[in-house]
């Protein structure tokens, strides 16, 4: 959903668009709530309130002020991520395809021959980091840039087994045009760039678990963040390989040698970060022209010093000369060295060239060892070739994708590797490594152990759900880690599957009830964005690839109506009720009937079940941005801080009724996941509330009326406003509560319109207009530890006779209250009050 705020209405009609006029009779929160539950994708918000826009954005719903028709057209035609703190819109708009254009935010690609393999008549455009270079296209009142690129297609091609790039590109563009936008992937980079600076500013020690290549630039500015990944492929792992021969396989039609070099250097930088927590000087031997240096410098400021007879235009300092063994003493401490020296074959005989390459490999290793043998804080990445060779058993082997699989690979060495044991590796084993292993991640740090780290802030995005982790260990980590942001895959199945297949792995699934947390927020991607200053125009869809975002140790926990709140809680319900269901009242009717309340007159205004909890349960796949457990807990301890809106405090029994309705809904839908979730939420409610039931009552509150429009044979027909189980010394507390509620009690607009047999030999009249006051009275008694109400649903009725009678229907008549009293069952009246 996107909310576009306008001062004036527009004449043009847009598809899937609805207009909302600010209601001045309601406050900003109530207007925001009403907007959030509208069912169209685009909301044109007229006569808007800035406070309402802020509320929506903090809830993760993109709400932007629009000042011109051009701005409106730009935002209504595509989805976007909005940095509402800095007023920056990041469009995810692929309409540039209509210019016969694909886009990249990686400069090195523009220096390759990729243009020869594009679709006929198409071009490649460099748009800068997250599309920053496109800002000049939009002369808007807010900062706007188009972050959409085709780098995902290019990178997927590089790692695929396909060679024909044009066919691959064509298929992927067609897929993009016929499937829903992967909005979370597109906005994730914006999110990471917003998230980590804010965390590092607050927390000195930060752990990041499971980063992938898409984050390779994000963390360049954060050397102090400790990374954990899947570990490195080291020399001693080659013992499992059987010898093979040269393969000579083409990987890419266009030249990706620069991409390989960039990955090698970035891998080395992150390896250095995890050892020394600071930025190194980067020395490079060979690898000209290294256009990719420009890409790295767009993200972070590094000093590059390079040696190569050819130009390296983006290097900080370039020596247009060869580098020799004797030059090693020119290299300073606190640095990384990338050795990419190899003579081009040209027209040379392959045997002669092979001999030179092997000599250069030995020379490269000698330079590496000499560099690492003196000084401090050094890491080296060195180019090697498949040959009989001795290497340290702890050396890290790299084989990032390159244009052709031939005989080259790389090794990362640190100061400890050069003093460890070396192992002889035959040429055939290195070929086996080259032919069968592709390094898929620039992060080669050790795997994360599922243990708490009291002094660290742990970030684990999309990293811990894999079934090679113990599910219980993941739960324990989340329960016990004081400060963290961790995601787990939400259980979107209908059969309550404990794990699901995703790509080539299995992931555990989770529900919010799997965790026992306090001072933590459990929300969706959208809800998490709102907490960190972002909002999004396309909410998460229940695709099966959805995650719970669990934030431990946040100062936003008590701000119940500002973050991870109830915005949009009824949206899915509205979509169903106003399009597919038997009546728009279907939800109200079902909730009452499933709790054996058969008086449906006015069910939409006087419902006996919490609609919030009911919708949060049955449609949890659509509205799990709302942190239901937090909402319940803060209510249970009386610490609900509400800024605005039409606030209604639910009685705990209303929440229980909602769970019962949700369970019946789940049974009818054969939804085992909702069934378990509702059962566990009901258990949680009973855990945090101290609910007691007057199932064996000794007192009741009665209401006597001036007159009753039915025949009766009881002595005094009355409405039982609830039963109590109290000791005699609590009578005073009950009377005090009734006196406090006197005005509200006598203001009740009670009406009746029919009679019915409540049970065998119990003839009663219905009573409407009672429930909201009953639940307020329930809350007052609950807070004073007075047992009030039974475990079955309270059905307001007026007892007329204890014999069988014919039912009667009349026009609804308002009843005037004569008195309200407290009486002992089968005893005397102990308190009576009149208006």
Swiss-Prot record:
Signal peptide: none annotated. Pfam families: Rotavirus_VP3. GO terms for molecular function: GTP binding; hydrolase activity; mRNA 5'-cap (guanine-N7-)-methyltransferase activity; mRNA guanylyltransferase activity; RNA binding. Residues 171-245, 429-555 are annotated as: N7-methyltransferase activity. Keywords: GTP-binding, Host-virus interaction, Hydrolase, Inhibition of host innate immune response by virus, Methyltransferase, mRNA capping, mRNA processing, Multifunctional enzyme, Nucleotide-binding, Nucleotidyltransferase, RNA-binding, S-adenosyl-L-methionine, Transferase, Viral immunoevasion, Virion. Residues 693-835 are annotated as: 2'-5'-phosphodiesterase activity. Residues 556-692 are annotated as: GTase/RTPase activity. The keyword Nuclease does not apply. It is found in: Virion. One of its GO terms (cellular component) is viral nucleocapsid. The keyword Transcription does not apply. One of its GO terms (biological process) is symbiont-mediated suppression of host innate immune response. The active site is at residues 718, 720, 797, 799. It comes from the Viruses. It catalyses: a 5'-end diphospho-ribonucleoside in mRNA + GTP + H(+) = a 5'-end (5'-triphosphoguanosine)-ribonucleoside in mRNA + diphosphate; a 5'-end (5'-triphosphoguanosine)-ribonucleoside in mRNA + S-adenosyl-L-methionine = a 5'-end (N(7)-methyl 5'-triphosphoguanosine)-ribonucleoside in mRNA + S-adenosyl-L-homocysteine; 5'-triphosphoadenylyl-(2'->5')-adenylyl-(2'->5')-adenosine + 2 H2O = 2 AMP + ATP + 2 H(+). HAMAP family: Rota_VP3, Rota_VP3_A. Multifunctional enzyme involved in mRNA capping. Catalyzes the formation of the 5' cap structure on the viral plus-strand transcripts. Specifically binds to GTP and displays guanylyltransferase and methyltransferase activities. Has affinity for ssRNA but not for dsRNA. Capping activity is non-specific and caps RNAs that initiate with either a G or an A residue. Together with VP1 polymerase, forms a VP1-VP3 complex positioned near the channels situated at each of the five-fold vertices of the core. Counteracts the host innate immune response thanks to its phosphodiesterase that degrades the 5'-triphosphorylated, 2'-5' linked adenylate oligomers produced by the host cell IFN-inducible 2',5'-oligoadenylate synthetase (OAS). The host RNaseL is therefore not activated. Interacts with VP1. Interacts with VP2. Belongs to the rotavirus VP3 family. Contains a bipartite N7-methyltransferase domain, a 2'-O-methyltransferase domain and a GTase/RTPase domain. The C-terminus contains a phosphodiesterase domain that degrades the 5'-triphosphorylated, 2'-5' linked adenylate oligomers produced by the host cell in response to IFN stimulation. This is Protein VP3. It comes from Rotavirus A (strain RVA/Human/United States/D/1974/G1P1A[8]) (RV-A). The lineage of its organism: Viruses, Riboviria, Orthornavirae, Duplornaviricota, Resentoviricetes.
């Amino acid at each position: 959903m996107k909310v576009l705020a306008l001062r004036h209405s527009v004449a043009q009609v847009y598809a899937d668009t609805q207009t909302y006029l600010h209601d001045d009779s309601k406050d900003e929160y109530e207007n925001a709530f009403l907007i959030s539950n509208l069912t169209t994708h685009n909301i044109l918000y007229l006569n808007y309130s800035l406070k309402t826009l802020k509320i929506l954005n903090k809830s993760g719903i993109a709400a932007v002020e629009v000042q011109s028709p051009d701005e409106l057209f730009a935002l209504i035609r595509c989805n976007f991520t909005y940095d509402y703190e800095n007023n920056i819109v990041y469009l995810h708009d692929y309409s540039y395809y209509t210019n016969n254009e694909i886009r990249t935010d990686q400069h090195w690609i523009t220096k390759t021959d990729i243009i020869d393999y594009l679709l006929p008549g198409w071009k490649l455009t460099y748009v800068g980091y997250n599309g920053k270079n496109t800002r000049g296209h939009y002369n808007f009142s807010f900062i706007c840039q188009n972050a959409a690129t085709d780098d995902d297609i290019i990178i997927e091609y590089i790692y695929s087994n396909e060679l024909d790039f044009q066919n691959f590109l064509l298929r992927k563009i067609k897929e993009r045009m016929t499937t829903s936008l992967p909005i979370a992937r597109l906005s994730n980079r914006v999110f990471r760039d917003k998230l980590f600076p804010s965390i590092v500013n607050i927390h000195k020690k930060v752990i990041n678990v499971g980063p992938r290549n898409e984050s390779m630039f994000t963390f360049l500015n954060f050397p102090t963040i400790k990374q954990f990944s899947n570990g490195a492929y080291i020399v001693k792992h080659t013992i499992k390989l059987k010898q093979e021969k040269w393969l000579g396989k083409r990987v890419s039609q266009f030249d990706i040698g620069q991409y390989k070099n960039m990955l090698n250097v970035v891998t080395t930088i992150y390896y250095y970060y995890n050892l020394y927590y600071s930025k190194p000087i980067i020395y490079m031997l060979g690898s000209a022209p290294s256009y990719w240096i420009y890409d790295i410098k767009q993200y972070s400021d590094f000093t590059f010093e390079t040696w190569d007879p050819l130009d390296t235009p983006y290097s900080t300092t370039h020596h247009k000369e060869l580098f020799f063994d004797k030059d090693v003493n020119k290299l300073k401490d606190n640095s990384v060295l990338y050795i990419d020296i190899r003579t081009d074959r040209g027209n040379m005989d392959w045997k002669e060239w092979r001999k030179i390459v092997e000599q250069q490999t030995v020379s490269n290793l000698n330079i590496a060892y000499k560099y690492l043998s003196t000084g401090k804080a050094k890491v080296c990445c060195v180019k090697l070739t498949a040959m009989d060779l001795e290497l340290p058993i702890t050396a890290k082997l790299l084989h990032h994708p390159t244009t052709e699989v031939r005989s080259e690979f790389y090794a990362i060495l640190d100061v400890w590797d050069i003093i460890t044991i070396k192992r002889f590796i035959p040429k055939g084993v290195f070929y086996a490594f080259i032919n069968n292993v592709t390094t898929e991640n620039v992060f080669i740090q050790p795997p994360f152990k599922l243990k708490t780290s009291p002094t660290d802030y742990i970030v684990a995005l999309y990293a811990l759900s894999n079934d090679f982790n113990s599910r219980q260990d993941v739960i324990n980590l989340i329960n016990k880690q004081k400060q963290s942001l961790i995601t787990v895959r939400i259980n979107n199945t209908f059969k309550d599957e404990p794990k699901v297949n995703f790509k080539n792995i299995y992931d555990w699934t989770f529900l919010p009830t799997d965790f026992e947390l306090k001072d933590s927020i459990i929300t969706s991607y959208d809800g998490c964005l709102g907490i960190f200053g972002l909002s999004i125009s396309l909410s998460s869809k229940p695709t099966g690839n959805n995650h719970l975002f669990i934030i431990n140790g946040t100062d936003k926990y008590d701000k119940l109506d500002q973050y991870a709140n109830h915005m949009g809680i009824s949206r899915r319900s509205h979509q169903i009720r106003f399009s597919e269901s038997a009546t728009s009242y279907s939800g109200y009717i079902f909730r009452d009937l499933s709790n054996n309340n058969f008086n449906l007159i006015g069910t939409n205004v006087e419902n006996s079940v919490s609609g919030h909890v009911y919708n949060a349960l049955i449609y949890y796949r659509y509205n799990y941005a709302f942190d239901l457990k937090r909402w319940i807990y803060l209510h249970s301890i009386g610490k609900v801080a509400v800024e605005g809106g039409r606030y209604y405090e639910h009685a705990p029994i209303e929440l229980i009724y909602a769970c019962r309705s949700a369970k019946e809904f789940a049974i009818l839908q054969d939804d085992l996941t909702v069934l378990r979730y509702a059962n566990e939420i009901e258990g949680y409610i009973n855990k945090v509330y101290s609910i007691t039931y007057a199932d064996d009552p000794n007192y009741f509150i009665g209401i006597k009326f001036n007159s009753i429009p039915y025949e009766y044979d009881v002595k005094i027909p009355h409405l039982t406003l609830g039963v109590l189980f109290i000791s005699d010394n609590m009578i005073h507390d009950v009377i005090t509560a009734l006196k406090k509620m006197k005005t509200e009690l006598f203001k009740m607009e009670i009406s009746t319109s029919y009679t019915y047999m409540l049970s065998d030999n119990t003839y009663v009249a219905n009573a409407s207009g009672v429930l909201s006051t009953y639940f307020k009275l329930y809350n007052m008694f609950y807070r004073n530890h007075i047992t009030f109400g039974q475990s079955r649903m309270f059905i307001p009725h007026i007892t007329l006779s204890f014999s069988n009678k014919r039912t009667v229907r009349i026009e609804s008549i308002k009843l005037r209250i004569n008195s309200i009293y407290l009486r002992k069952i089968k005893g005397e009246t102990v308190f009576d009050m009149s208006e």
